[in-house]
C-alpha cells in the first residue's frame, strides 16, 4: 500500500494549455517510473480543446471549432474547457494491484462518491465509459468522462467532470462516440460548485480511492 502522504497534490487556478499538460504528464510519468519523482494528482482546467483518444473516428468530429489534439489515451473524442475540472492521476501501480480494469473502476467510484457530496446521484453504465446521471429533463446524460493510459505500470490522464462548462461546446463532437445521450453539468442540475469546492470534496475521498487500488477488481465489477 502506498500512502497519500507521499503523493504530490497540485491544484491549478489558471487554465493550463492542453499540449503543455500533455508534455508535463509524459515527463512526470517517465520520472515516476524511474523513481525520480513522486506520484501526482493534478487538478486543473484547460482552454477550449477537443482531444482524440486512440479509438476516435473522424466522422465523430462534427464541427472542429477548437483545436483538436491527439491525446494518446484510450477512448474517443472529448471536450475540455473552462468550467470543467480535469483530474490527471499519475500513480505507480507497481506499488498496488497491477490491475488496469480495477484502476478504472476505482477512478469511476472516486468521481461518483464526490458527486454524491453535492447531492448528485451518478453511476457507471454497462457498455458506456464515463459517469452518468439524470439531466434536468430527466433523461440519462453524461456528467463525467474517463480516459486513461498506462505506461510501465504508471498511470496517465484520468477524469473530467462538468462543473459549469458551456455545454454547447460539446456539439462539435460526438462525445465519447455515444450519439444517443447528451451531456449535463452540476450547474445545469442547479448545483453551483467552484473548482476549489470540487477539489476539497474529491481529496476528502482520496484515501478510500487509494485503498481500492490495493485489491484486484472483482469480475462482477467490470
From Swiss-Prot:
It comes from Novosphingobium aromaticivorans (strain ATCC 700278 / DSM 12444 / CCUG 56034 / CIP 105152 / NBRC 16084 / F199). PANTHER family: LIPOYLTRANSFERASE 2, MITOCHONDRIAL-RELATED (PTHR10993:SF7), OCTANOYLTRANSFERASE (PTHR10993). It is an enzyme of class 2 (transferase). It comes from the Bacteria. The active site is at 176 (acyl-thioester intermediate). Its EC number is 2.3.1.181. Its main location: cytoplasm. HAMAP family: LipB. This is Octanoyltransferase. The gene is lipB. Substrate binds at residues 73-80, 145-147, 158-160. Transmembrane segments: none annotated. The record marks 142 as: Lowers pKa of active site Cys. It catalyses: octanoyl-[ACP] + L-lysyl-[protein] = N(6)-octanoyl-L-lysyl-[protein] + holo-[ACP] + H(+).
Amino acid at each position: 500500500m502506498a500512502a497519500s502522504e507521499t503523493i504530490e497534490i497540485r491544484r491549478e487556478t489558471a487554465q493550463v494549455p492542453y499540449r503543455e499538460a500533455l508534455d508535463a504528464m509524459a515527463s512526470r510519468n517517465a520520472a515516476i517510473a524511474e523513481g525520480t519523482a513522486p506520484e501526482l494528482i493534478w487538478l486543473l482546467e484547460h482552454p477550449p480543446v477537443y482531444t482524440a483518444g486512440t479509438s476516435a473516428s473522424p466522422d465523430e468530429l462534427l464541427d472542429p471549432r477548437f483545436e483538436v489534439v491527439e491525446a494518446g489515451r484510450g477512448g474517443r473524442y472529448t471536450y475540455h474547457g473552462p468550467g470543467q475540472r480535469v483530474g490527471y492521476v499519475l500513480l505507480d501501480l507497481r506499488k498496488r494491484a497491477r490491475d488496469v480494469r480495477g484502476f478504472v473502476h476505482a477512478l469511476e467510484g472516486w468521481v461518483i462518491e464526490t458527486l454524491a457530496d453535492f447531492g448528485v446521484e451518478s453511476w457507471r453504465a454497462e457498455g458506456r465509459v464515463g459517469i452518468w446521471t439524470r439531466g434536468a429533463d430527466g433523461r440519462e446524460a453524461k456528467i463525467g468522462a474517463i480516459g486513461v493510459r498506462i505506461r510501465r505500470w504508471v498511470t496517465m490522464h484520468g477524469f473530467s467532470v462538468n462543473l459549469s462548462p458551456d455545454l454547447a461546446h460539446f456539439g462539435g463532437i460526438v462525445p465519447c462516440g455515444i450519439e444517443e445521450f447528451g451531456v449535463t453539468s452540476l450547474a445545469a442540475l442547479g448545483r453551483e460548485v467552484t473548482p476549489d469546492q470540487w477539489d476539497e470534496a474529491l481529496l476528502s475521498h482520496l484515501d478510500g480511492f487509494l485503498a481500492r487500488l490495493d485489491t484486484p477488481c472483482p469480475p462482477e465489477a467490470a
